Amino acid sequence: MRTATITRTTKETTITISLNLDQQSGIQIATGIGFFDHMLDAFAKHGRFGLTVDAQGDLDVDPHHTIEDTGIVLGECFKQALGDKAGIERFGSAFVPMDESLARAVVDLSGRAYLVFDAELTNQRLGGFDTEVTEDFFQAVAFAGEFNLHASVLYGRNTHHKIEALFKALGRSLRAAVAINPEVQGIPSTKGVI
């Protein structure tokens, strides 16, 4: 089983995440930010990952620390659970519509952290979630997980729909990239390491 459990504590947050890449063994999300919980649930459900998130943060200050630090720990969990990445597909992509919105996510589990994020999020706040932090979350996941991530909203009107489509697309693209392919011998890189 490819799993990881990581706890990260700072003066601002304490985040514990358990991730199971191979079995959707249950999804339990508790960040104190309702919309963010909904997005992480959609990410795990459509990525078919087992995911438990317990995030305690300084929400009285701002949700930014909790959201970004959750991204850091989630990325670290992917990195740890993947190990040496032998036999994985490595690349994954997904287009996900949500009503009038269409999002795309493309990943390369290359060992190199990079983010290209292109989404016009016109509504600045959804419940307790500052929408500008969406990009910070995606960057935190990609950089801590050490992978390339290109995430974009091709079009849409409703900010909730745009962000939800992005989270679902990220889940589906990572599902494709972490999949074991019996035809892949060893590490999927000409360098021999990722």
Swiss-Prot record:
GO biological process: L-histidine biosynthetic process
Top-level class of the enzyme under EC nomenclature: lyase
Localization per Swiss-Prot or TrEMBL: Cytoplasm
Main localization, broad class: cytoplasm
Transmembrane segments: none
Catalytic activity: D-erythro-1-(imidazol-4-yl)glycerol 3-phosphate = 3-(imidazol-4-yl)-2-oxopropyl phosphate + H2O
GO cellular component terms, A-Z: cytoplasm
CDD domains per record: IGPD
Keyword vocabulary terms for this entry: Amino-acid biosynthesis, Cytoplasm, Histidine biosynthesis, Lyase
Keyword Nucleotide-binding: no
A GO MF label: imidazoleglycerol-phosphate dehydratase activity
Biochemical pathway: Amino-acid biosynthesis; L-histidine biosynthesis; L-histidine from 5-phospho-alpha-D-ribose 1-diphosphate: step 6/9
Keyword Manganese: no
Top-rank taxon, per record: Bacteria
E.C. number(s) listed in UniProt: 4.2.1.19
Pfam families, alphabetized: IGPD (PF00475)
NCBIfam families (UniProt xref): PRK00951.1-2, PRK00951.2-1, PRK00951.2-4
PANTHER family linked to this entry: IMIDAZOLEGLYCEROL-PHOSPHATE DEHYDRATASE, IMIDAZOLEGLYCEROL-PHOSPHATE DEHYDRATASE HIS7
HAMAP family referenced in this protein's UniProt entry, alphabetically: HisB
Family to which this protein belongs: Belongs to the imidazoleglycerol-phosphate dehydratase family.
Protein name: Imidazoleglycerol-phosphate dehydratase
Organism: Lacticaseibacillus casei (strain BL23)
The gene coding this protein: hisB
